[in-house]
């Protein structure tokens, strides 16, 4: 189940596309019976969260808050929360030449990958969708490939 909370209004069509793509990524991880909360916000909100939890005073595209840690004896029904800044996502979509819907789906798949227990090295600003490679990144590429299968044509 995907609980979608919009604290910043997304454009028409984004919500169903996000649900479909994230559902495909959850199925990829075998987590279709799990729950995830996605919160769509603006830069001020995500900046405040990043400052509070990571000590960095800057907006970002996506933050993940898992409810469990790898190595815990079981995975709970609710995997955690994914927070996405629609402001940052819009800028990134424009610079990458694709839609906001596609960018938000990409960010959600990235956040989900963190929620199921995977991490990646910091890539000096290079995002996984921009060519970051290596074993640690492959799981993120695979999640995005799965998420894309749920996107509507032209998204």
From Swiss-Prot:
Keyword Ribosomal protein included in the entry's annotation: no
Keyword entries, A-Z: Cytoplasm, Endonuclease, Hydrolase, Metal-binding, Nuclease, Ribosome biogenesis, rRNA processing, Zinc
Residues the record lists as binding Zn(2+): 110, 114, 120
Subcellular location: Cytoplasm
Enzyme Commission number(s) of this protein: 3.1.-.-
Protein name: Endoribonuclease YbeY
Binding note for cofactor: Binds 1 zinc ion.
SUPFAM superfamilies the UniProt entry points to: Metalloproteases ('zincins'), catalytic domain
BP term (GO), one: rRNA processing
Gene Ontology MF term list: metalloendopeptidase activity; RNA endonuclease activity; zinc ion binding
Pfam assignment, any one: YbeY
Function noted in UniProt: Single strand-specific metallo-endoribonuclease involved in late-stage 70S ribosome quality control and in maturation of the 3' terminus of the 16S rRNA.
Membership in a protein family: Belongs to the endoribonuclease YbeY family.
Organism of provenance: Deinococcus radiodurans (strain ATCC 13939 / DSM 20539 / JCM 16871 / CCUG 27074 / LMG 4051 / NBRC 15346 / NCIMB 9279 / VKM B-1422 / R1)
HAMAP family in alphabetical order: Endoribonucl_YbeY
Top-level taxon of origin: Bacteria
Enzyme class: hydrolase
Cofactors (names): Zn(2+)
């Amino acid at each position: 189940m995907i609980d979608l909370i919009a604290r910043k209004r997304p454009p028409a069509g984004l919500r169903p596309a996000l649900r479909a793509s994230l559902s495909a990524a959850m199925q990829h991880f075998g987590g279709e019976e799990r729950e995830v909360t996605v919160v769509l916000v603006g830069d001020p909100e995500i900046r405040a969260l990043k400052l509070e939890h990571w000590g960095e005073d800057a907006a970002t595209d996506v933050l993940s808050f898992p409810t469990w840690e790898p190595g815990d004896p079981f995975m709970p029904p609710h995997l955690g929360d994914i927070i996405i800044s629609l402001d940052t996502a819009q800028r990134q979509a424009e610079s990458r030449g694709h839609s906001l819907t596609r960018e938000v789906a990409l960010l959600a798949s990235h956040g989900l990958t963190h929620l199921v227990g995977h991490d990646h090295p910091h890539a000096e600003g290079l995002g996984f969708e921009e060519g970051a490679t290596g074993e640690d990144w492959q799981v993120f590429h695979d999640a995005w490939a799965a998420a894309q299968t749920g996107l509507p044509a032209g998204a």
